[in-house]
């Protein structure tokens, strides 16, 4: 989790490259084409793929709020495949997940590292999943700052405060003692899908659709 780095977006832009599949649906009014992500949004499925930054956070927050307005009583399905990223951007997603009325079910595909694992754990208890070969990693927030000594000290205190807050929140969502969280996030802690269940980050490993 990078608390101080610029919130840039990835160079990978499948929409701009024209690589996103289109789905054509027939209706009494004729044909309508959707990109695959818009079509899945109709099924209340949203994605975090790639780094957590201001761009991805803005899109995810908007989708969460839209789905709440569509149906406040129906679950949202949040698929995560992310190496992590900005703490402030991740907190925007986290706070919105907790704020909206629908339950948010999280599912890790591929990896959920750093802020990605934090958001995975923040799903509705009993509705947090990962696929068998996914990987999860937790660690403390990263920060880098240059400037006068007094400014560096201010930023160091801020990062320590963020770390303590994130540890408290992760302890709440996983059920782990805060002392264990502090120890495990001191360095990169990698977990298999089964390890993530045991740790309390997710509730179940799904091997097929029937398991969900």
Curated annotation (Swiss-Prot):
GO biological process assignments: protein quality control for misfolded or incompletely synthesized proteins
Pfam families named in the record: CLP_protease
Reactions catalysed, as given in the entry: Hydrolysis of proteins to small peptides in the presence of ATP and magnesium. alpha-casein is the usual test substrate. In the absence of ATP, only oligopeptides shorter than five residues are hydrolyzed (such as succinyl-Leu-Tyr-|-NHMec, and Leu-Tyr-Leu-|-Tyr-Trp, in which cleavage of the -Tyr-|-Leu- and -Tyr-|-Trp bonds also occurs)
InterPro entries, per the entry: ClpP (IPR001907), ClpP/crotonase-like_dom_sf (IPR029045), ClpP/TepA (IPR023562), ClpP_His_AS (IPR033135), ClpP_Ser_AS (IPR018215)
Superkingdom classification of source: Bacteria
Keywords: Cytoplasm, Hydrolase, Protease, Serine protease
Gene Ontology CC entries for this record: cytoplasm; endopeptidase Clp complex
GO molecular function: ATP-dependent peptidase activity; ATPase binding; serine-type endopeptidase activity
List of catalytic residues: 114 (nucleophile), 139
Protein localization: Cytoplasm
EC number(s) on file: 3.4.21.92
Claim: Cytoplasm is one of the keywords in the record: yes
Transmembrane segments: none
Subunit structure: Fourteen ClpP subunits assemble into 2 heptameric rings which stack back to back to give a disk-like structure with a central cavity, resembling the structure of eukaryotic proteasomes.
Family: Belongs to the peptidase S14 family.
Name assigned to this protein: ATP-dependent Clp protease proteolytic subunit
Species assigned in the record: Aromatoleum aromaticum (strain DSM 19018 / LMG 30748 / EbN1) (Azoarcus sp. (strain EbN1))
Lineage per the UniProt record: Bacteria, Pseudomonadati, Pseudomonadota, Betaproteobacteria, Rhodocyclales
């Amino acid at each position: 989790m990078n608390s101080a780095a610029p919130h840039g977006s990835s160079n990978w832009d499948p929409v701009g490259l024209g690589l996103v599949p289109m789905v054509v649906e027939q209706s009494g009014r004729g044909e309508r084409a959707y990109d695959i992500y818009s079509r899945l949004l109709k099924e209340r499925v949203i994605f975090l793929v790639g780094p957590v930054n201001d761009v991805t956070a803005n899109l995810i927050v908007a989708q969460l709020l839209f789905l709440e307005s569509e149906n406040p009583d129906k679950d949202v399905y949040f698929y995560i495949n992310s190496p992590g990223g900005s703490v402030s951007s991740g907190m925007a997603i986290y706070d919105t997940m907790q704020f909206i009325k629908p339950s948010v079910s999280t599912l890790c595909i591929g990896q959920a590292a750093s802020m990605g694992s934090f958001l995975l754990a923040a799903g509705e208890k009993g509705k947090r999943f990962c696929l068998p070969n996914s990987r999860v990693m937790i660690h403390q927030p990263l920060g880098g700052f240059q400037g006068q000594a007094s400014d560096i000290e201010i930023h160091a205190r801020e990062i320590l405060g963020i770390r303590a807050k994130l540890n408290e929140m992760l302890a709440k969502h996983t059920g782990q003692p805060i002392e264990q969280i502090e120890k495990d996030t001191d360095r990169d802690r990698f977990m298999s899908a089964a390890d993530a269940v045991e740790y309390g980050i997710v509730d179940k490993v799904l091997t097929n659709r029937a398991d969900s």
